[in-house]
Amino acid sequence: MNIHEYQAKEILRSYGVSVPNGRVAFTVDEAVEAAKELGAPVCVVKAQIHAGGRGKAGGVKVAKSLEEVRTYASELLGKVLVTHQTGPEGKEVKRLLIEEGCDIQKEYYIGLVVDRATSRVVLMGSEEGGTEIEEVAAKTPEKIFKEYIDPAVGLQAFQARRLAFNINIPKHLVNQAVKFMMGLYQVFVDKDCSIAEINPLVVTGDGKVMALDAKLNFDSNALYRHPDILEYRDLDEEDPKEVEASKYDLNYIALDGNIGCMVNGAGLAMATMDIIKYYGGEPANFLDVGGGASEEKVREAFKIILSDPNVKGIFVNIFGGIMKCDVIASGIVAATKQVGLTLPLVVRLEGTNVELGKKILQESGLNIIAAESMADGAQKIVELVR
């Protein structure tokens, strides 16, 4: 789960991690009032959307008066911001962060992620802050320093100190930087984060180390033990189809193609998308109905797939283990009748009760195209949507 920058900073502040003073605003008047409360000679008006690259897209403005705050807030609220992370459709700005301006002397990058190769959390740092860290990693990987954290003992002060020296934090501010990194790590562990990223971490003219921007993502599987974090969820920032799918415990991710996919099991779902690509098609989604799907779940899965106007055909690929093929077949027939499906539908069934499942499809009287294998099914649906 993702949250907004201002929400991430609220969490960091509660852990003693230094962030600029700021207020969230939902209207132009609230933005001006927030700037008045801050009383700073310079304020920054920042669009709040779940995407990076806001500055380059014109979503971050520096205001030197209340009039400028009003002007920038009017420009940004309701604007569709397009960044390299939003896709061409962009995201509408519905809230702003009004923040005190900082006298920035130097920008750095600090981040925490789970490294799957070592099964450890890794603390990363670079003095190339304020830029895309992926770009730095690709062009000048030697400028990124890493500290691998032993889960038994957590981040040690000597590791944070070593990283601070490696990225050339001024010596008189190293202790501040160490405290900052230790606090950030505590947030990462306590809140079950998947990413904690500060870009940029800045050194200010008055000798402070603080997070000018903050990104926290959370492991959705751990949210049951973090009701406080769940309250930060902003459904407006999520794909409506993905929100609807989550109500039925369906794992759905929207993609840019035109072939809808319904599969049981994440591995098979990824293989299905791969084979569609192999035969020249483009999957419109990842959709895993899980191992214990009912007819209702199958029906809702169909509705969600069809709510995407780009979908020109559907490929159902089921291997029945716990999931029985006859249940899937009944769900497919019911869903097809209920939604009045007119698009090409290719179904490949294999496993438990497969013959019964095929019989249900054959006797349904519907135009359902059977596939003998995954490759056969992929080829058929790709040809049908061309």
Curated annotation (Swiss-Prot):
GO BP annotations, alphabetical order: succinyl-CoA metabolic process; tricarboxylic acid cycle
Catalytic activity field: succinate + ATP + CoA = succinyl-CoA + ADP + phosphate; GTP + succinate + CoA = succinyl-CoA + GDP + phosphate
Coiled-coil stretches: none
Gene3D superfamilies: ATP-grasp fold, A domain, ATP-grasp fold, B domain, Succinyl-CoA synthetase domains
GO cellular component: cytosol; succinate-CoA ligase complex
Keywords assigned by UniProt, alphabetized: ATP-binding, Ligase, Magnesium, Metal-binding, Nucleotide-binding, Tricarboxylic acid cycle
Family: Belongs to the succinate/malate CoA ligase beta subunit family.
Protein name per UniProt: Succinate--CoA ligase [ADP-forming] subunit beta
